C-alpha cells in the first residue's frame, strides 16, 4: 500500500455521485480514509478522519485543516485522486493513452452511476487483476462461451502502454445466443458499434469494462497478503 497504491492516481468515485453542491463521498486509498466533496465549483479530495457516512450532503461548507489532495475528473467522469503530495504526472499522462480506444464513447454524453457493489475476496490483489486481464477464464463461464466465442474474440490482442497499463481490442458480443437475452445494439454507447466490448486495465489494479450498454469500473484495495477489497461502479 505504501510503496505502490499511495503513489499512483486512483479512480475512486464518479462525479455523478457528487453532482450537487455539498455532496460528499467517502472511501479509502492504501489503507487511508479519504473524502471527496463538491464545493459548488469543483470536486475536492481530502484525507478523512471525522466523516463516517459513505455519502450524503453537508448542510454547511466543509472546514478542514487537512491539505487538499490532488484531484482530477477524467475518462468518463471518474474522480481520480492520489495520496502523493507531488505527483509527477497528470491523470492523462499517467493513463498514457490506454483510454483512447473508448474515449469517444465515454466522454460524449454525461453518465450516471446506477449500481455500486463491494466485496472482500480471499486472494492476492495481483491474482484478481490478472483474472481481469487474461482471456482463459472466459472458458469457465457459459454465458461468455455462447455469446462471445467467435473469430473476433480469438483475434483480440492485449495492447501494452507505459506505466504498466493494457487495453484489449474489441469484439462483437452476440447476446441473443444466450437463452432469454436480446440484442443490445440499440442501447450501445455513442460512437460505439453495436454490441461491442472493450476492456482497459490499469496498473496496479483498476479495470474498466465497456460492454455496449453499460460501463463498469473495478478498483482494488489490498487488505493483506491474501485479502483484497474490490469495489464496482456501473454507469
Feature map (PLM): residue ranges:
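N-terminal pre-ligand scaffold of iron-sulfur
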Residues: 1-49, 71-72
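Short, hydrophobic/aromatic-rich segments at coil-to-beta transitions
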Residues: 9, 22-24, 60-62, 200-208
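C-terminal catalytic domain of Rieske-type non-heme iron oxygenases
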Residues: 18-19, 35-43, 69-235
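A generic, well-ordered mixed alpha/beta core segment in the N-terminal half of proteins
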Residues: 44-62
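Phosphate/diphosphate-binding loops
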Residues: 66
